[in-house]
Amino acid sequence: MRLSSGGTTANMSTKLSSRKEKGKRLERLIAQRINDVLGGYGVTAKRMIMSGAIAGWKGDVFVDGLPVSIEAKNQEKINIWECWDQAESQAGLGKMAVLVFSRNFNKDPLTVIRFEDLLTLFELAIQAGWVSHIRKGRRTIL
């Protein structure tokens, strides 16, 4: 059976599956990196199946110990504003919306947060005494 896009249903199914696998791969990477860096502080992360719909959690990665909601996108082309709207709506009240995206793993993933949240993180870093480490060029913050 041919579809209007010129592909067969089997090809379309394979492409959809491939896209989902790329998304899952980024979600697993995010969770693993959070666990590697913050696990010693009692923070744990795990990829949520079906974006957490089953557990009542919204977001792609659940982080226990931090008030964040992470939306992950691993796509060649991305509509930042559309993805950001999704991240914010899933975060709800009391959680920092975080959008992590990658261009099919061609580059390191990038992260989008609200500017006010960035200022809050800077303020917390200063209060915790991490600023001297930043000035020395050491990467000790998240």
Would you name each region that the model predicts?
Residues 1-142:
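Catalytic phosphate/metal-binding cores of nucleic-acid and nucleotide-processing enzymes, i.e., regions
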